Structures are given as structure tokens and as C-alpha cells.
Amino acid sequence: MSKRHRLDLGEDYPSGKKRAGTDGKDRDRDRDREDRSKDRDRERDRGDREREREKEKEKELRASTNAMLISAGLPPLKASHSAHSTHSAHSAHSTHSAHSTHAGHAGHTSLPQCINPFTNLPHTPRYYDILKKRLQLPVWEYKDRFTDILVRHQSFVLVGETGSGKTTQIPQWCVEYMRSLPGPKRGVACTQPRRVAAMSVAQRVADEMDVMLGQEVGYSIRFEDCSSAKTILKYMTDGMLLREAMNDPLLERYGVIILDEAHERTLATDILMGVLKEVVRQRSDLKVIVMSATLDAGKFQIYFDNCPLLTIPGRTHPVEIFYTPEPERDYLEAAIRTVIQIHMCEEEEGDLLLFLTGQEEIDEACKRIKREVDDLGPEVGDIKIIPLYSTLPPQQQQRIFEPPPPKKQNGAIGRKVVVSTNIAETSLTIDGVVFVIDPGFAKQKVYNPRIRVESLLVTAISKASAQQRAGRAGRTRPGKCFRLYTEKAYKTEMQDNTYPEILRSNLGSVVLQLKKLGIDDLVHFDFMDPPAPETLMRALELLNYLAALNDDGDLTELGSMMAEFPLDPQLAKMVIASCDYNCSNEVLSITAMLSVPQCFVRPTEAKKAADEAKMRFAHIDGDHLTLLNVYHAFKQNHESVQWCYDNFINYRSLMSADNVRQQLSRIMDRFNLPRRSTDFTSRDYYINIRKALVTGYFMQVAHLERTGHYLTVKDNQVVQLHPSTVLDHKPEWVLYNEFVLTTKNYIRTCTDIKPEWLVKIAPQYYDMSNFPQCEAKRQLDRIIAKLQSKEYSQY
């Protein structure tokens, strides 16, 4: 008999003792069952209470979110149905599974989601996090007033201080307005004076709208288009919108056009205002909004026929301003010293913003600040140094929004230091900045029409710029601005406002674009500030010599083609003409290299090694062919980062040049311009390239005088070869790409050319009847006489 069977028999045996033991066990079993039942009831009650609390939480969350959404002009959320199915599942599950499921649910309160109208997907949690921050921006209090003005007026001016949220929010409200209209949906364009702002703001707005950058929200800058057929909101540089107008004169694809940062008065913005003023007369459905960060908006209102003004105050804190008692001899040295002192001595937390004039200065300052802070030892707080200028790639530009390093255990404060060009004055807002260092300088374009010289010069900023810079310190809490100039200089030497770019620029590109737009009467074009007649005449003269305009001032077929290239007229002419010299492939590469930042890196601590590396690429005939050698070597070395580092070459510049070259190639293909090369073994390989350079730059030539200095042809300016040239001799005739005004007059990026090429390629310009007397004229006279007597059968 089995043990189990015997046990069963034993339990049935009629023994009092045994029976009593069995009854006790039964009672224990019953009690256990009862306890478990009570536990289940208690668990169920607790679960019900938790679920009720969960419902209440969800209800409160939905109510607060709906209030937020309604204030944002979005539809409120509906009650989630998923909760009911979850509760049914709870009751069907065992105690353990119900408890674990509920615990997971309670740990993360799910927010009922509404559908993103652009993607037809539920909004992500990040969308709601960003929306809460958006609703705190000062501009949100004015949404109803803005919408009312937008509906009732065709154009108006909006003044909003930097940080008010106008650049990110206003275009989104315009998208809402356009979507509410019946009929075909037109897009919204928002122009920016700087490419960095166009890219970074587009990324931010794409995040706010919960869409992918390049889809519903995109950007367009020179040589880079991040948009698609789905794009309804496009941020772009002002020059790119002007370029779009060439092929779409009434800008039909847009229902609202916003000119942001109009106070900067860039060349393209001023031209756009004139163009748009005419377009709104022909398109009653187009809305134009002019946005400015400064309060002198009256001029814009008058220009746009006394249109309305909407003013949105920023949320600023007081800023304490400090001046230097004496002028600083070396503002870069003073700026670096000030950064170190603030980092070491200031007991308040807060980041620093240092304004400098350009990439070289910024890179140098970043290196020196890092080195000096590292030398101070581990007791000093950590520092994160971030450069900011227009040619940085987008991912590096975004670093300005990173948090500062944390405090050390000894209490030393970690800080972020942003070293920027004047882009950080108004175009971008960097939260966390408490200390601003302002040396008082910026690079500005300056043009002298008499000698046809345009240069970027380091000049003193205006009072308006100084005020904008100081205001960056009071964004989040009271701040301090250290002006590295005297109070007297601020009050008596600085101009009130920055001089409009149109009054200090070469207008060759502008006139070519206006002609392409069909605007022939330049004298009566409605400029907000008309340029000097001499500047306009010089531009017309340049385009006539380049054969872009005929003698009547009308656009030629060549000129129309030149206008399609996003290049200066001389470069555009050179690219097109290179086809006739069988060297368009090489000229494309040179043009691309001239269109990007300097490719040669020359660190302070390794100047000799950098110079030696540069000479490995040097071409005997000059700098243009040296750039070609660099590009060819870069491609032959498979675009290697390490190769660039080893050869002191800026990898970013070469990659940008490669991108520019591809885009220019596509434009050439569109016009069926052949891309070809002379056989490399031919003696004409480099000669043809140099001749093609002359087709564009015959007006930028210098002749070596007997005295040993160069004289620019026709304008008779005494100049020297720039120290950066690879030319190891002084050619008698040189073509130059750039006239640089510093302590001396330099010509930069030079190539050795033959004088006979000048008179053959540009006979109209080298007409000796109106040539000033000089050695160059005498030599050219002899060459022309020889050519006319057919002593030179070919050149």
C-alpha cells in the first residue's frame, strides 16, 4: 500500500487524539484562507483608491494641459480611452499581476495626447515640455493682438526686444493663420541676416512644432538648402529670399514674409524691403511683417506707408556697466584678462559672453583662455569655452545651449564662456549669461567707389550695438557688462546707429540681381536710404565691362546667366568663361576654395611648421593655383581628417568647398555649360586656367613699378603683396582677388599673369585713350602696337 493511502486511512481512524489534531489543522487552514481573502480585499480596495487618485491626477493634468493648449490656440485633449481598458485588465488579473501592473502605471502618469496636425501622430512628451517654456515667453501675452493686426493689415512693424520670443513664435502663429485660410496653402518665410541664426532657429522651431528639420520646417542659406516639398515654414538668409525672387518675382509660394532683425539694415534686407513694397501692391493676399529688436521703428513704419506698430517688451533685469579708465592698447589681451579675472574672482554663478570681431580672433582667444585656466591648477572652477561664428557647422553652433560645468567639491564655480562675433547681439539668445565683455569693435564692410576697393575693416560699434550687447547680461537675472573702452568714448565718439550696409558696399551684385528682377530704373528704385550715385555708377560700369549689361544698361544673356550663380559677378563671369578655355573643372575648384574661409591653419605655437606645410602645395605662378593644388590633394587623400591635420589644412573649409563645388556644378549643368579640363600634360594646362582668371578679374590687376612697389592698374594705388602669398618672386603683372586695407595697402590671393592677355581678353577696359599716364600704360601701348602689327600671331 502506498504511503499516501496509509496516511488517508490513518486520518479516518476513530481515535480521539488523532481527531483533535486534525480539527486544529482544519481551523488553521480556514484562518489562512480567511486572511488571504481579507488581504485580497484590502489589496483590491487599495488598488481602487490608487486608481481613483490616478484618475484625479490625470483629470488635473488634462485640465492644466488643456488650459495651456487653449491659451496656445490648440485644440483641448479628450479623455483617454486607454485607461478603461487598463482597468478591465487589472480586474481580470491575479493579485500579483494587478499589483505589479498598477505599480508600473502609478510610476509614470500618462498624459493624454492630442494629434500633431503636421505629422498626424500623437505629440511627444517633449512637445509639452517645450510648450510650457514657450508660454512663458513675453510675446505670448500679445498673441491675440498680433493675430488681430495680421488679419486686418497687409503689412506692419513689430518691435520685440531680444529674448522676447518673436523669432520663434511669430512665424508659427503665421503658419496657424495660413492654415486657417481657405484655398491653396501658401508657406511662411522668415529672413535672417546671418546663416547661423537661420540654421539654429529653424532647428529650435522644428523641435517646438514636433517635426523633423527639413520637413515642415526648413532653412535655406547660400550653398545649403535644408527644405522639402512639405516645408511650410522656411527660415533663410535675406540674400536667399532675394535669389528666390529672381525666379518667382511675386513670391507666389509665400502667404506671409517676415523680415527679421531688420534693424541690422543689411544690403539684402534693404533691397528686399524695396522689392516687397512693390510686390504687396500687386498681391493683396501677401502679408509682410518687419521685425526689429530696437525701438527706432518709426522709419520702417513711414517706409511701409505708415503701417501699424506692435511693441513687445522683453523681460530684462538690471545690468551694471563698467568702463575702463583709459583706452586699451590691445583689446584682445584685455578681453582675455577680463574673462580670467571674472572666472576667478566673481562669487556669483553665471556664464560669460565675450564679443570679438572674427574667426581668427575668436579661435585665438579660445585657445589662450583654455591654456591660462588650465595653468591655474585644480582649485579653480572648470570652464567650457565655446566659439560662435557664421562658418561653424550647425552641430557646433548648438553647443552654445549646453549647460556650464558643475561646481567642484571645494565650491569653485564652473562656467561656460561663449566667444562670439556680433551675431550674439540680437540674432541668438543664450540663457545663463550674466557677464558680458564688450571690447567695442566689429568687422564692417567698407567701400570706396573712387578706387573700387571694398574691405572688411575692424571698426568701432555704434551705441545701439553697445546697448544690445549689454542687454545680453540681463536675460535671466541681474548682470554685469564690462566695456573695454572709456565712458567718454561711448558718449562722444560712437555713432548712435550702425551705418546701413547699402551706403558702404560695392553694389555690383545688387544691381545685377535688380536687373534680373526686371527693375531697370535704379535711380527711382524705392531704397529706404538711397546709395550715392557714384556707387551705383561704379556698379553699372563693372557689369558693363564684364558684359553682363550692354551699353544701354540692359541685362545681356550672359548677365542673366551670371545672376543665377550665388557668386560675386567677377567669379560668376570667370566660371562661365572657363568653358571657353577648357578648364571649367579647375576653375570650379578654385571658385569653391575662394568662397569658403581660409583653408590654411597657422597656429601661434607652430607657425614655422605650418608655413613649411603650406609651401608643399605652393605653385610658382601664385595663390589661385596653390588653392587648386590643395583641393586636388584633399580629394586624392580621400578627404582625410588626419591628412588635413598633418598638413595644417582646415578640414571644415575643404568640406565646405567640396559642397560649394557640387552646387555650382549643378548650376552649370542646368545651363548646359560643359565641365572639362585641358590635358594635364599640356603646357597650356595652367596657362588656360590663368587666362580664365583674367576673364573675371581683369579690373583687379597691379603692375610692378621701377621703384619696386606695385601700382594698381587705372586707379594708381600703391600696394604690396600680402605676406601670406606663396609667390617667392615679384611678377611684373599680378591679378589679385582682394584689396586689404590695414596699416598698409595689401593685395591678397595673387597670380602671375601676362599683360597681352589683358588687352586681348578685355580690350574695352584696356582702351588706352582713357588710361592714366604710368609705366603700365607705356608697356601696354607697346604690346597693343605689336599685336596690331601682327608680330604676336597668338597669345
Curated annotation (Swiss-Prot):
Q: Per the record, where are the segments of Low complexity compositional bias?
A: 79-108
Q: Does the keyword Acetylation apply?
A: yes
Q: Which residues carry this modification: N6-acetyllysine?
A: K488
Q: Which segments constitute the Helicase ATP-binding domain?
A: 147-313
Q: Name one GO biological process term.
A: mRNA processing
- Can you tell me which residues the record assigns to a coiled coil? none
Might you give the EC number(s) for this enzyme? 3.6.4.13
The UniProt subunit note reads as follows: Component of the U11/U12 snRNPs that are part of the U12-type spliceosome. Identified in the Intron Large spliceosome complex (IL, also named intron lariat spliceosome), a post-mRNA release spliceosomal complex containing the excised intron, U2, U5 and U6 snRNPs, and splicing factors; the association may be transient. The IL complex exists in two distinct conformations, one with the DHX15 (ILS2) and one without (ILS1). Interacts with TFIP11 (via G-patch domain); indicative for a recruitment to the IL complex. Interacts with SSB/La.
| Activity regulation behaviour | ATPase activity is enhanced upon binding to G-patch domain-containing proteins. G-patch domain-containing proteins act like a brace that tethers mobile sections of DHX15 together, stabilizing a functional conformation with high RNA affinity, thereby promoting the ATPase activity.
Q: What is this protein called?
A: ATP-dependent RNA helicase DHX15
- GO terms under cellular component: nuclear speck; nucleolus; U12-type spliceosomal complex; U2-type post-mRNA release spliceosomal complex
